[in-house]
A protein has these predicted regions:
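Loop/turn elements at helix/coil->beta-strand transitions in domains of secreted/extracellular proteins
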Residues: 73-75, 121-125, 150-155, 193, ...
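Membrane-embedded segments
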Residues: 61, 65-153
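Catalytic cores of nucleotide-enabled group-transfer and carboxylate-activating enzymes in metabolic
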Residues: 107, 131, 158, 267, ...
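Second-shell loop/turn segments in exported
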Residues: 83-101, 128-129, 213-220, 255-258, ...
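Serine-dependent acyl-ester chemistry module
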Residues: 105, 160-269, 282-294, 327-335
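N-terminal secretory targeting modules
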Residues: 1-77, 88-90, 95-101, 149-151, ...
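Short, amphipathic alpha-helical "lid/cap" segments that border enzyme active or binding sites
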Residues: 136, 140, 220, 224, ...
Length: 335
């Protein structure tokens, strides 16, 4: 019998299938019992949607293995979605997938490079816990599961567009993180017999049409609640926290969506101020600067390599101002 991929069973909505489970998109993704999908491990320069993707054995876009934190290492985890992942950074073309400028890096890699240069005698790791399509709902679940193992000294968190985007059902229903649901998905992931039975049962139900009313994957209240929980989890494990307001290019291309992004970001900024969490909102990477910020974006949602340089520069400045990285020297970085 042909193999049934757990990704096809875990990802059910039309919107998410288009993002990660279509034949064109699924080349870099696999099923995950907790989070529904994740990056495949050990990818080596795989072309995906104008992006050259490599991952380590832990399914992270990093060029070194990630395990328990070695003694003396300062570790920064960047929790996020396709922005933090580095979508199309650097950009590549299908006819020349390995022809790119290695200095055009996503902001986690830039932070690591600059902090290492400024502290040559220290062990420093900065890596993205970030997957295209993720929301704050998934990011919180991932952090809760792995923070005790990873022991980061700092967590940088940024989510936005996926949270506000419309789906057939909200994440709290589709991505049930209770242990009973996760165990059921684990069994599907590890047993082809169960996977085939699951697919057969769903095919019988598919004959009955269901009318869906699209809603945000994560409501504004849930969005703020998730970030508050991310901050609490990080602080409970002794990690400093920075929250980044999600980038969005302009308010002209899609006015309704831009308004949602403005609202989500405003709620988040207000809530982070209440609990005195360092919050970074980069004006040039928001719709408020839409008439002059095209040079920082690849398209409407994702900053290009110059946008990521700006993010790294602003993050380093905030780290220095707020003394967030202990005794590390924080360099100035010109975008």
């Amino acid at each position: 019998m042909p193999r049934v991929e757990s990704l096809d069973l875990f990802v059910n909505t039309v919107q998410q299938k288009m993002q990660v489970a279509s034949p064109q998109q699924s080349t870099i993704f696999e099923g995950d019992p907790l989070l529904l999908w994740r990056l495949k491990p050990n990818l080596g320069h795989v072309y995906w949607d104008f992006t050259n993707v490599s991952t380590n054995a832990q399914s992270i876009r990093a060029d070194y293995p990630i395990g328990r934190k070695p003694a003396g290492t300062f570790r920064i985890v960047c929790l996020g979605d396709s922005v933090t992942f580095g979508y199309r950074v650097p950009p590549v073309w299908p006819e020349k997938p390995n022809d790119f400028n290695p200095e055009w890096q996503p902001y986690p890699m830039l932070l690591e490079t600059e902090l290492r240069k400024a502290n040559p005698n220290r062990s420093i790791e900065v890596f993205p816990m970030a997957v295209p399509g993720y929301t704050s709902h998934q990011g919180l679940a991932w952090l809760r599961r792995d923070i005790g193992y990873l022991q980061p000294d700092m967590v940088i968190a940024s989510f936005g567009w996926n949270d506000a985007s419309l789906s057939d059902a909200p994440d709290r229903e589709l991505i049930d993180t209770r242990w009973t649901s996760v165990t059921g998905r684990w069994l599907i992931d590890h047993s082809q017999a169960i996977a085939h039975v699951t697919r057969w049962m769903r095919s019988r139900k598919a004959a009955t049409p269901v009318v869906h009313t699209p809603a945000p994957r994560v409501s504004q209240k849930e969005y703020v609640d998730n970030f508050n929980a991310i901050v609490r989890v990080a602080k409970d494990h002794g990690a400093a926290v920075i929250v980044i307001g999600a980038p969005y290019r302009d308010s002209v291309t899609n006015p309704a969506e831009a308004q949602l992004m403005t609202q989500y970001r405003a709620w988040l900024k207000s809530e982070m101020a209440k609990n005195q969490t360092p919050y970074l909102e980069i004006l040039e990477l928001t719709e408020a600067a839409g008439s002059v910020n095209q040079g920082f974006f690849g398209e409407l949602i994702h900053p290009n390599h110059m946008g990521h340089r700006l993010m790294a520069s602003e993050l380093l400045e905030l780290m220095s101002q707020r003394h967030l990285v202990g005794d590390l020297r924080v360099p100035e970085f010109v975008p």
